[in-house]
């Protein structure tokens, strides 16, 4: 049994250096046609949505081709992005044409705090606000999610964030900082407890009780076996106990790969931002 959603990491390239990032670095990329052939095959087996992620997915030279191809296959597409593509008219046009949902990061109501947690792009906070302002003037029905990683640095600077946005998101999702891959040093100094995260989430839900935005939380271990990642090298992975675990490769025997996925991924609980709660 396959999940309804696959997170396709088009590239591991990124133009930011976020200290909490758990993205992997993949140097070897297989032929794009092989990746698309696999996605076309699983589309016929029930997978119906793709989250395009990375790295920063819009940095891939194949980004436009991937969008067009997956859209033609009948996939519903979401984009998890840092927003840096917005100044490229051609990429922006493709995103607005093909993507149903955009997830953008905001780490604080305070621009200085946000920019300290999202280094690499000058005035990133201001850039996100500009994107939201531009989206508010379009007549396109694009669903919006704002994501925030809660740390010791920003936990006290989140109240009122929704009030400063020019466009009200459908979902504001807060993530408890989790350790994975290369962010262990940051995790050790910035991690907040389950109790602190729960209280933060509750307080924000109360503060913004009259908002139409749904405020939800993702706890540190919520991710276990609830994602299926497709890497640019053709590997399929999931997360177990905050570590990425190899399931197999798209070149593996179909029966073997399906069995591995059904064993290692909780296909009924795969996280997708296409559900009503964008979880």
Give residue ranges: language-model regions.
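Active-site beta-loop-alpha junctions enriched in small/polar residues
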Residues: 55-57, 82-84, 107-109, 149-151, ...
């Amino acid at each position: 049994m396959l999940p309804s959603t696959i997170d396709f990491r088009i590239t591991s390239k990124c133009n930011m250096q976020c200290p909490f990032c758990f993205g992997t670095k993949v140097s070897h990329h297989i032929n794009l046609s092989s990746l698309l052939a696999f996605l076309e095959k699983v589309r016929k087996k029930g997978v119906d949505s793709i989250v395009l992620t990375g790295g920063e997915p819009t940095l891939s030279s194949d980004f436009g081709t991937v969008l067009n191809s997956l859209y033609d296959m009948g996939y519903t597409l979401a984009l998890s992005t840092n927003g840096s593509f917005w100044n490229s008219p051609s990429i922006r046009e493709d995103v607005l044409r093909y993507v149903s949902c955009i997830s953008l990061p905001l780490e604080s109501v305070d621009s200085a705090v946000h920019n300290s947690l999202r280094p690499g792009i000058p005035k990133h906070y201001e850039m996100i606000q500009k994107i939201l302002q531009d989206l508010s003037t379009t007549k396109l029905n694009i669903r919006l999610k704002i994501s925030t990683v809660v740390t010791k640095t920003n936990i006290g600077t989140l109240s009122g964030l929704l009030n400063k946005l020019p466009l009200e998101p459908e979902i504001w999702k807060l993530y408890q900082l989790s350790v994975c891959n290369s962010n262990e040093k940051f995790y050790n100094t910035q991690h907040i407890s389950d109790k602190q995260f729960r209280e933060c989430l509750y307080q924000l839900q109360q503060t913004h009780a009259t908002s139409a935005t749904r405020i939800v939380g993702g706890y540190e271990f919520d991710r276990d076996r609830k994602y299926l990642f497709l890497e640019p090298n053709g590997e399929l992975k999931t997360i177990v106990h905050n570590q990425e675990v190899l399931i197999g490769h798209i070149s593996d025997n179909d029966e073997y790969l399906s069995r591995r996925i059904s064993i290692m991924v909780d296909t009924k609980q795969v996280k997708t931002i296409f559900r009503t709660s964008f979880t």
